[in-house]
Amino acid sequence: MEPQRKHSTALHTCHPCRRTIPYRIYAVFHTCGIIALMYHHVHSIVNANNTLITCLLLLSDIVLAFMWATTTSLRLNPIHRTEYPEKYAAKPEDFPKLDVFICTADPYKEPPMMVVNTALSVMAYEYPSHKISVYVSDDGGSSLTLFALMEAAKFSKHWLPFCKNNNVQDRSPEVYFSSKSHSSSDEAENLKMMYEDMKSRVEHVVESGKVETAFIACDQFSCVFDLWTDKFTRHDHPTIIMVLQHNETEMMPNLIYVSREKSKVSPHHFKAGALNTLLRVSAVMTNSPIILTLDCDMYSNNPTTPLHALCYLSDPKINFDLGFVQFPQKFQGVNKNDIYASELKRPFDINTVGFDGLMGPVHMGTGCFFNRRAFYGPPTTLILPEIETFGPNRIADKPIKAQDILALAHDVAGCNYECNTNWGSKIGFRYGSLVEDYFTGFMLHCEGWRSIFCSPTKAAFYGDSPKCLTDVIGQQIRWSVGLLEVAFSRYNPLTYGIKPLSLLMSLGYCHYAFWPFWCIPLVVYGILPQVALIHGVSVFPKASDPWFWLYIILFLGGYAQDLSDFLLEGGTYRKWWNDQRMWMVRGLSSFFFGFTEFTLKTLNLSTQGYNVTSKSNDDNEQMKRYEQEIFDFGPSSSMFLPITTVAIMNLLAFMRGLYGIFTWGEGPVLELMLASFAVVNCLPIYEAMVLRIDDGKLPKRICFLAGLLSFVLTGSGYFFLK
């Protein structure tokens, strides 16, 4: 895998961020402030008239202090890296083989044309075509997706040569033909017509819900559609593996469709199970040393992305224990100020450079180049699979369409194949959490593998972001449940991870494992001081009390550092403001309900299902609201009841506080400041409650229930504030 070098031997460099020293100094002062705050809380409990209120505030501040510590662990040694792919020089036959795994599960939430564009964009990489094998896992077992990929295989014979001969940069056909800068040559226009014809056929099939005989009568794969009988369902069906295109001429990549066997009586382990099936099938067919995992909506935006990854994976100084190279998730179509914080800048950019200065970033689930060897035990101890001849170091030299190869591939994709094996525990992607990406990355790090964050100037991948608040919240409820599954298991990062990793790396992983815990201080600080303010009671120090300034300093210091993080990593003030607002929204919705769902699941009172986030944006009115930066609350949903209740409570407290200024004298100033800050953040909610009449407004039922709950909370304050 080691290349020849042009000029300098360095394929990559790294340098520490300039903010490191100031952040370390600030961490010392902020820690002193937190210690002082804890002392104040303990002193208050001893002398408190109402122990319950003081204990709730103490609990909230303990959670805030812990989460600040986890964030600070990622601020102490952030680094930035630069790759030089132009220095990577190797003959085509010397490039390492590359297997690409693309996962999809529902042709209606993840349109087949989206899958097609993702597959074509990576098949067209600036990389020796015969070295690329693209495996598409269809966990929904849909004939619609298979038909779309059959069409893609035909179109690729024209699209790939066009891209490479004309140095096309946008290698997703949909993106290229939608751009104003695409070529107007006859060849390009003919290709566009071919693409539109393919697109219309695929969309017609999806709309009708079945593959009509007229579309496949002359196709060599037409007989495979006979498998879709009345007994065939997405949860119960046989294995289907189709080699739609293979590189026998060394001019085109392999394209393989894989739908693993499903049975209602056998656990399938969601996406982790699908990826492990692809690991085994690819080991049988191609066994490439490098694996790229992609979600079906993350198309390639940079044709040289594999070369950026090879700058690290081919470096003999670091590749012995280099498990994976993680690229950031970037999203297309995000509105100017990112009202839903869809870019997830803190987890995908800011925190990641902090992880990179330790043992490397967490696995983000997509856009990741793996060393295949990393899935088979620690760097120093190879754990062979049950079929030893198909270990990570074997050279696959048989034709992938050979009958014995296809038969074995079908066998390893069976629903009972993993029984009594190490798959999911010691080999492959790990089971036990809905967030298989986070958990797998954590286990690889604990085994001694390192990772690297690679963020080229030209984004490697672009995906689709939710355009409706319901989709944003729903997606993160699932994340919250999965993260808590790790936090409350034997693999808790703080107990299990501290020995093989380090204190800072363990705290970094804790930042995500305990992510849903943000809901505790947000609920307490969103309701308790406001109820107190309405009743004219102080729960914080008054303005004349020296402790008053400790709260002010900690609040302003924390927010100033958060803003600094954002601006230094290329963000804007408006995006930061929307990000911190969405932190509150998530805390009072997705984190709150995720915490609740996990608790019910632990008590066997609820079963969490895996729901695919819709990536289809066909609602024109919804898109229009998104582009105008108007919050879209979508259909009626109880997910918005807590945040609406908190919004009403803060508005009532704010109005009561303004009136009280003239009657209370010194009064509860901190409570009024907190309510004022919350009211400013809740302006889109008030607008959706009262001023709007479109379909994206808050439903009247939610507003009524929130008002009723606010009345109950305010009334109850009369009793517990005594």
Swiss-Prot record:
Q: Name one Pfam family in it.
A: Cellulose_synt
Quote the cellular component terms of the Gene Ontology held in the record.
Golgi membrane
Q: Which GO terms describe its molecular function?
A: cellulose synthase (UDP-forming) activity
Q: How does it sit in the membrane?
A: Multi-pass membrane protein
Tissue expression, per UniProt?
Expressed in young seedlings, primarily in the vascular tissue.
| Biological process annotations from GO | cell wall organization; cellulose biosynthetic process
Location(s) in or outside the cell: Golgi apparatus membrane
Q: Which UniProt keywords apply?
A: Cell wall biogenesis/degradation, Glycosyltransferase, Golgi apparatus, Membrane, Transferase, Transmembrane, Transmembrane helix
Give the Enzyme Commission number. Answer: 2.4.1.-
Chain segments annotated as transmembrane: 25-45, 51-71, 514-534, 548-568, 583-605, 635-655, 660-680, 702-722
Query: Residues in the active site?
Result: 139, 437
Q: Which InterPro entries match?
A: Cellulose_synth, Nucleotide-diphossugar_trans
Question: What's its job?
Answer: Thought to be a Golgi-localized beta-glycan synthase that polymerize the backbones of noncellulosic polysaccharides (hemicelluloses) of plant cell wall.
UniProt family annotation: Belongs to the glycosyltransferase 2 family. Plant cellulose synthase-like G subfamily.
State the name under which the record lists this protein: Cellulose synthase-like protein G2
Q: What organism is the protein native to? A: Arabidopsis thaliana
Q: What is the lineage of its organism?
A: Eukaryota, Viridiplantae, Streptophyta, Embryophyta, Tracheophyta
Q: Which gene encodes it?
A: CSLG2
